Amino acid sequence: MNFKETVLLLGMSMVVPVTSIAQDKVEASVGADLVSGYIWRGQDLGGVSIQPSLSVAYKGFSLGAWGSAGIESADTKELDLTLGYSTGGFSISVTDYWFNGGPGYFHYGTHHTSHVFEAQIGYDFGPLAVNWYTNFAGADGVNKDGDRAYSSYISLAAPFKLAGLDWTAEIGATPWANDFYNVSADPECSGSDGFAVCDISLGASKEIKITDSFSVPAFAKVTVNPRTEGAYFVFGLSF
């Protein structure tokens, strides 16, 4: 996610934790998404991008890396590291987001860093998943008084099946004033003065059969941001 306007589309398992059952053996996964646009929490973070992921998990604990690199040289490069734990429907995690274009990777100064540190807690009830995210350190935004905003985001996501596709309807909001989310070129629509709904989305996924033994997962997602008045439609393939 771009720390100013981060938007991941449907393929970002780093940002929306999924329920997992504790296993007695180490499990690992590697993959990548190719997306037509990088949209994260109602924010436009870039155009066509490749987004690789790598993770290991053991007995409910997980450590993962996720990145994004746009095909345009001007697009921000991103590297996210997430340490999490889940049991049943409950999940908790800490993510370190880093973006190029600013201070180098090993700069962790309070006021001189390109890292953003975020804590997440959530519960997946099955028909509805609820997740809360708060920035607690790094290059967070500020509130109307110029103080650290502890910028936060809450999302409600409901999965369902329809016409042979797997769907997810989601709504997300920022609960208080900050300038971290909802960045817009229009100053009247940029930032949040208080509670603001910033992501209303509907996504669907299916597997596209290539051969009798090989298929490629595909997904599409429509997102609107009432705060910035932005609207996006993204398509992606997972490998």
Spans of features found by a protein language model:
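Cleavable N-terminal export/targeting peptides
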Residues: M1-E27
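Residues that define the transmembrane beta-barrel architecture of outer-membrane proteins
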Residues: D24-V26, G46-I50, D75-L79, T113-F117, ...
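Short loop/turn motifs that connect adjacent beta-strands in outer-membrane beta-barrel proteins
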Residues: A22-E27, F160-A169, S205-A218
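Outer-membrane beta-barrel initiation region
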Residues: Q23-A57
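Outer-membrane beta-barrel translocator domains and adjoining extracellular loop/strand segments
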Residues: G42-G47, A74-D80, P103-T110, A139-D147, ...
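Outer-membrane beta-barrel "beta-signal"
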Residues: L202, I208, T228-F239
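Detector for outer-membrane/organellar transmembrane beta-barrel domains
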Residues: T110-P187
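Transmembrane beta-strand segments that form the barrel wall of outer-membrane beta-barrel proteins
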Residues: V30-Y38, G60-I71, S91-G104, L128-G138, ...
